[in-house]
Amino acid sequence: MSTHIQRSALLPYPARALFDLVNDVKRYPEFLPWCSASQVLEESESLMRAELTVAKGSLSQRFTTRNVLVPGASIEMNLENGPFTELHGVWQFKALGEKACKITLDLTFDYAGPLVKATLGPLFTQAANTMVDAFCQRAKQLYG
């Protein structure tokens, strides 16, 4: 059975700045405690393929997503490979004037079997639940 998580936040920063922050996959290990490594495999104005490694203690798992980009507006993530049967997410960035934005993360995922769910489940669920907060804190660090 799939897990669905939706989180949002209102921030005093432009939509494009927040889009750029979320799309800066290479820097994830700097501020996402569960992300031990990240690599951009392919990148263009409208597409990114990225590999993330999630880790806690001795447990680590890698997964690759194909992200469709609408600069300043949305990032749609779809699983290419990894320990999931399903992983689909959408970040949306809705401008509220010139210097404010509502960000929303809508994420659906399911694990590839009970062993993966038992080992990776708690870590990934916690990561998904705290992801918007982590990006809000990062925005405050970078943009004041």
From Swiss-Prot:
Keywords: Toxin-antitoxin system. Pfam families: Polyketide_cyc (PF03364). The keyword Phosphoprotein does not apply. Belongs to the ribosome association toxin RatA family. InterPro entries: COQ10-like, COQ10_START, START-like_dom_sf. One of its GO terms (molecular function) is ubiquinone binding. GO terms for biological process: cellular respiration. Toxic component of a type II toxin-antitoxin (TA) system. Binds to 50S ribosomal subunits, preventing them from associating with 30S subunits to form 70S ribosomes. Its antitoxin is unknown. This is Ribosome association toxin RatA.
